[in-house]
């Protein structure tokens, strides 16, 4: 009878222990802890790669911005550079055209020369003043030494001057009804005429009193 009448509390105690034991496998705390994923080394590498990729994109964007600015600056400078290039090209073409015209005119003129005129022209082309004599003359006048370029320039100018005087003297000789060779009187008259035309500067120094 005593066994049959066990108190409910004793049964309840055994039941409670069994419930607690059964509840251990399904403990929510243990389940939640196991369910949280832990960070691994692979995830850290992925984050570093993403950060590096973002930095690369920013750098490439900065480079593209700088390139755009440089292109804009060059586009602003291009019109002036193009204009200068076009002007230089036009001047070169114009000069080349003028040279071709001069050569053509000279060929026509030479083809119309008489034999005597052609001989005089050839002699004039081949003639030249001795550069050493020109250099000594310049140094005696200026009292200083001069470069070779100055000597060449003065030699060419002197040749042109003598050619103009001789040509004018031949015109004087023809006008006076005389025949060559040229005489001193022809040369003096040629120089006088060229001075009157203003083609020869006056060598006499004039003191200017009033300004």
Swiss-Prot record:
TBP and TAFII18 bind to distinct domains of TAFII28. InterPro entries: Histone-fold, TAF11-like, TAFII28_dom. GO terms for molecular function: nuclear thyroid hormone receptor binding; nuclear vitamin D receptor binding; protein heterodimerization activity; RNA polymerase II general transcription initiation factor activity; TBP-class protein binding; transcription coactivator activity. CDD domains: HFD_TAF11. This is Transcription initiation factor TFIID subunit 11. The TFIID basal transcription factor complex plays a major role in the initiation of RNA polymerase II (Pol II)-dependent transcription. TFIID recognizes and binds promoters with or without a TATA box via its subunit TBP, a TATA-box-binding protein, and promotes assembly of the pre-initiation complex (PIC). The TFIID complex consists of TBP and TBP-associated factors (TAFs), including TAF1, TAF2, TAF3, TAF4, TAF5, TAF6, TAF7, TAF8, TAF9, TAF10, TAF11, TAF12 and TAF13. Its main location: nucleus. Residues 1-81 are annotated as: Disordered. SUPFAM superfamilies: Histone-fold (SSF47113). GO terms for cellular component: Golgi apparatus; nucleoplasm; nucleus; transcription factor TFIID complex. Belongs to the TAF11 family. Residues 35-45, 53-62 have a biased composition (Acidic residues). The keyword GTP-binding does not apply. Pfam families: TAFII28. It is found in: Nucleus. It comes from Homo sapiens (Human). Component of the TFIID basal transcription factor complex, composed of TATA-box-binding protein TBP, and a number of TBP-associated factors (TAFs), including TAF1, TAF2, TAF3, TAF4, TAF5, TAF6, TAF7, TAF8, TAF9, TAF10, TAF11, TAF12 and TAF13. Interacts with TAF13 both in vitro and intracellularly; also interacts directly with TBP. The keyword Acetylation applies. The modification N-acetylmethionine is found at residue 1. It comes from the Eukaryota.
């Amino acid at each position: 009878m005593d066994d049959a009448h066990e108190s409910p509390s004793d049964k309840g105690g055994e039941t409670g222990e069994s419930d607690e034991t059964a509840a251990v496998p399904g403990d929510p705390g243990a389940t939640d802890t196991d369910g949280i994923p832990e960070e691994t080394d692979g995830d850290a590498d992925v984050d570093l790669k993403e950060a590096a990729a973002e930095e690369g994109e920013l750098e490439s964007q900065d480079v593209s911005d700088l390139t755009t600015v440089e292109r804009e600056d060059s586009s602003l400078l291009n019109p002036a550079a193009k204009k200068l290039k076009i002007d230089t090209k036009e001047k070169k073409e114009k000069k080349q055209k003028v040279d071709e015209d001069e050569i053509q005119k000279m060929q026509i003129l030479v083809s119309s020369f008489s034999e005597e005129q052609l001989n005089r022209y050839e002699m004039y082309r081949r003639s030249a003043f001795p550069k050493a004599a020109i250099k000594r003359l310049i140094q005696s006048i200026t009292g200083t030494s001069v470069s070779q370029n100055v000597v060449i320039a003065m030699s060419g100018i002197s040749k042109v001057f003598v050619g103009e005087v001789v040509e004018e003297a031949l015109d004087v000789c023809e006008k006076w009804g005389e025949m060559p060779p040229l005489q001193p009187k022809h040369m003096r008259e040629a120089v006088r005429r060229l001075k009157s035309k203003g083609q020869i500067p006056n060598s006499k120094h004039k003191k200017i009193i009033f300004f």
